[in-house]
Amino acid sequence: MLSDARELASDQQIDADVCMVGAGPAGISIARELIGNGASVWLLESGGRDVERRVQRLNVGKSVGYPIHLPHQSRIRAFAGTSRHWFRPGDETWAARPLDPVDFEVRPGIRYSGWPFDRAHLNPYYAHAQVLCGLGPFDYDPGRWSDPARTPPFALPPGPVETTLFQHGTADFDGYFEELVRAPNVTLLLHASVVELATREDPGRVHRVEVRRDDGSRCFVRARLVVLAAGGIENPRLLLLSRRVHRRGLGNDRDLVGRFFAERLSARTGYIVPATPDLIDGAGFYPTHVAAPGVHVQGALRLTDAAQREGEFLNCAFFLLIRDLSFTVEAVRSLATLVKARRRRPLPPELLGHLRNIVTGLGDLGATARARVRRSDPAGSVLALRAQAEQMPNPDSRVTLGTRRDRFGLPVAKLDWRPTAADRASIRASQEAVDTALRAAGLGRVEFMLGDEQPPALFEGNFHHLGATRMHPDPAMGVVDADCRVHGVSNLYIAGSSVFPTYGCSNPTLTVVALALRLADHLKKQLAA
């Protein structure tokens, strides 16, 4: 069923068995699992069926740490949530990959590492999530998807570097709208901006969810079970806003809500100079391509799990992008970086260095421009390396409440994102291993672009907001337990990437959906009890 909060009476109360806050991939996945369950399910979405500018302004935020895309740039309030960023004209697929087994382990040298369960425990949910995400079979063995005659992976020697695989999903979560609207026991409530999880009747239980409508008036949802699925920034923000009873915020008795905030680090870290031009022609496994009917895949290079354990490295995948020789010119790279960052606020910390490269490299820029006009610059001369890397869990990297307020008079999210020297060092060490492997195979060598500066230059985020309501069985170490229930609150659960204790190098949505399906199984048991 479909409803709109703007059409409800002021102060109206809705009674439900399950109230879910946020209709992105996590909320949609759980709601679908509860169709026909017999429970009354309300799925609350701050936005409407489509993106609306007025609603999107509620995503205003502030950055006080390393430059990061602000919430109004990176988050979307509308049905299907931030997954709407993935589907743009000419780019109708999105990258997906499960976390690696090593990501779930307690890793020496990686502080705060370890999940409450291993990868094998999550595999059945991953297999189910593949279907929801429009992916191929749950098989990420590169050999399964490569054509030896046409797109073989690089022939690397046995050792620490391997080719890994990403699939590209085709499922648009917006496509689940009609299914949910038709469900007799599920009500999708649009334009319902949640502002508080109230615990005034019992400090250990959410007794109702307060919703604000466009005009500022209120309505309420009272539910047996509440699931917060509002995204990696809004999840901690809503807990911190719920402070009428819990003065530090709901679930924040140990000052953990908002801490360990991470992004998936992305950076152009170097390029491969091929030993022969044949390497470019033989790199067809690494760009996104169709490997089987309906299955899009992309290869990347990474350290094996064993090499990560031995070297105490963070996880990192290197995508290979075919580029012409202009990519090797510092002035060209700096100009491209500043053009790409023109909408970032604040500006990149390496701004002066980029400007210096441009000024001192005006001759190179001119030569490159003339070559482009004449089309005389040979295409595909190098393979650019783009790292997609894990961050070290860092309690000082966090989401808090700022002094600025949104139109409801509530503090906006303040992001203090803090990549560390360990993050940069791990990427560089991983890239050195790639260089060694390529040289040993006679394929080429790596030219490095990532320096030793701190804060690290070149880093940017991928809109992957992670870790700020982390999972741990010990309430002194995490916000939610192994069932994703908030410690100390009997009926409040959190879904989404904010519960990740560590982050891996994979795009998070497949794992978000797998965890949501796992949580749905738990909710069914609670409803039946």
Language-model region placement:
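Mid-to-C-terminal "cap/lid" subdomains and adjacent gly/pro-rich loops that border
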Residues: 29, 225, 229-230, 237-379
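Glycine-rich loop(s) and the adjacent beta-strand/alpha-helix scaffold that form part
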Residues: 36, 47-52, 56-59, 197, ...
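Short beta-strand "acidic-cap" motif of Rossmann-like dinucleotide-binding folds
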Residues: 39-45
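Conserved redox-cofactor binding core of oxidoreductases
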Residues: 68, 103-206, 458-461
